[in-house]
């Protein structure tokens, strides 16, 4: 993978790293070193095989976080190394369990997260191991238990809040926006809100309009919140662990169709950088930016494109807020063409924000307008054939690349 942060004392860069004005830093929490690991050191390893060692209590600075060659080929697939195979939901569970072992302040709350193990079994076995006080079954009231988690974070705990379905978190939007995202700023920096909000979402199981929403478009405008989307067992575990260790509130998006995806992951402790994209396939002709389930639609299309003589570069952006413009920019400067593929709605979606960011920062490097393929602006139908029609299909990706590369 493009970046691994090793060691029990690992830390991730906070959003405040990007702000040079002191007043802006109040929007997000400053980095804080865990007293129990203060004497340890950690290694940041880049895909170019370079390594940097940092002492205890030091923050990963922006220039250090971004590897010198962010669009380099991955040195080795994790499946080729020693490790163990896990399904994606099992990788999430393993990452959560490891962090609960590591830090007694980590707790879990949500509907049926206890002895039932969660609606998709991400919290299976945690209640038996850690007890009902650290794995708390809540009433069916998202606004209440989300607010409870935020309050717990203000007192020093590190709650992981599960929405049984991401669509249900609309009922907690007031807590997520006015409290989770803004309390660090509105309290004058007195409180940090190290909360992880996670749960299943996306299109693909005929769950109907209410259970198939893509809430990343709703949450991206909330100040102070980071958003990441997992797409493999490897980055699911790494992002889960990094989100729990972050001093900022993080929303982790999980796709219902990816829970049973299997991959070999390392036995050693690792976390993924919350603000770094992953180079999935290096190429020369066009940059394709995607995330979550659409990563696999893009890779399916890439096989067809290669047979047609095209060489697409595929990047899983992973960080939906903030964007890794370093990795994206390096790719744009090389290929000069950009296609964005997302499952989010077209109007006000992640693709629209990413298009704006690319045009603002890399307009002079573009040989063609940025193209974005998104889901239809319609409620998700229940019928399977209609459901698939609303999201981007590989054939559409192939056609779009052919148009952009003419």
From Swiss-Prot:
Record keywords, A-Z: Chloroplast, Metal-binding, Oxidoreductase, Plastid, Potassium, Pyruvate, Thiamine pyrophosphate, Transit peptide
Residues at which thiamine diphosphate binds: 142
Chemical reaction(s) catalysed: N(6)-[(R)-lipoyl]-L-lysyl-[protein] + pyruvate + H(+) = N(6)-[(R)-S(8)-acetyldihydrolipoyl]-L-lysyl-[protein] + CO2
Keyword Cell inner membrane annotated: no
Annotated InterPro entries: THDP-binding, Transketo_C/PFOR_II, Transketolase-like_Pyr-bd, Transketolase_C
Protein localization: Plastid, Chloroplast
Transit peptide: 1-44
Subunit-level organization: Tetramer of 2 alpha and 2 beta subunits.
Protein name (Swiss-Prot/TrEMBL): Pyruvate dehydrogenase E1 component subunit beta-2, chloroplastic
Origin organism lineage: Eukaryota, Viridiplantae, Streptophyta, Embryophyta, Tracheophyta
Gene behind this protein: PDH-E1 BETA
């Amino acid at each position: 993978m493009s970046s691994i942060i090793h060691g029990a004392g690992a830390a991730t860069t906070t959003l405040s790293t990007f702000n040079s004005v002191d007043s802006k830093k109040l929007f997000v929490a400053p980095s804080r070193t865990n007293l129990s690991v203060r004497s340890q050191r950690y290694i940041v390893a880049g895909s170019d095989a370079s390594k940097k060692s940092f002492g205890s209590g030091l923050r990963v600075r922006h220039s250090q976080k971004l590897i010198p060659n962010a669009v380099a080929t991955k040195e080795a697939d994790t499946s080729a190394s020693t490790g163990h195979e896990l399904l994606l939901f099992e990788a999430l569970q393993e990452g959560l369990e490891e962090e609960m072992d590591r830090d007694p302040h980590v707790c879990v709350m949500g509907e049926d997260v206890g002895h039932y193990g969660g609606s998709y079994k991400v919290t299976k076995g945690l209640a038996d191991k850690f007890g009902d006080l650290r794995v708390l079954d809540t009433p069916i009231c998202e606004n209440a238990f989300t607010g409870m988690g935020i309050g717990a974070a203000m007192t020093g705990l590190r709650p992981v809040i599960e929405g049984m379905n991401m669509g249900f978190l609309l009922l907690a939007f007031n807590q997520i926006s006015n409290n989770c995202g803004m309390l660090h700023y509105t309290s004058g920096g007195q409180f940090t809100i190290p909360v992880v909000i996670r749960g299943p979402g996306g299109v693909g199981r005929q769950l109907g309009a209410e259970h198939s929403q893509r809430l990343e478009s709703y949450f991206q405008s909330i100040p102070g919140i980071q958003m990441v989307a997992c797409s493999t067992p490897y980055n699911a575990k790494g992002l889960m662990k990094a989100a729990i260790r972050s001093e900022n509130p993080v929303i982790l998006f999980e796709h219902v169709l990816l829970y049973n995806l299997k991959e070999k992951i390392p036995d050693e402790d690792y976390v993924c950088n919350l603000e770094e994209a992953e180079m999935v396939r290096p190429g020369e002709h066009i940059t394709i930016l995607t995330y979550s389930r659409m990563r696999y639609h893009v890779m399916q299309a890439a096989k067809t494109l290669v047979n047609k003589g095209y060489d697409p570069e595929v990047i899983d952006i992973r960080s939906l807020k903030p964007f890794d413009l370093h990795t994206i920019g390096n790719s744009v400067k090389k290929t000069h063409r950009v296609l964005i593929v997302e499952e989010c709605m077209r109007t006000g979606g992640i693709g629209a924000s990413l298009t704006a960011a690319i045009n603002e920062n890399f307009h002079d490097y573009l040989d063609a307008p940025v193209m974005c393929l998104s889901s239809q602006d319609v409620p998700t139908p229940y019928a399977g054939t209609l459901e698939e029609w609303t999201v981007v299909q590989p054939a559409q990706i192939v056609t779009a690349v052919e148009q952009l590369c003419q």
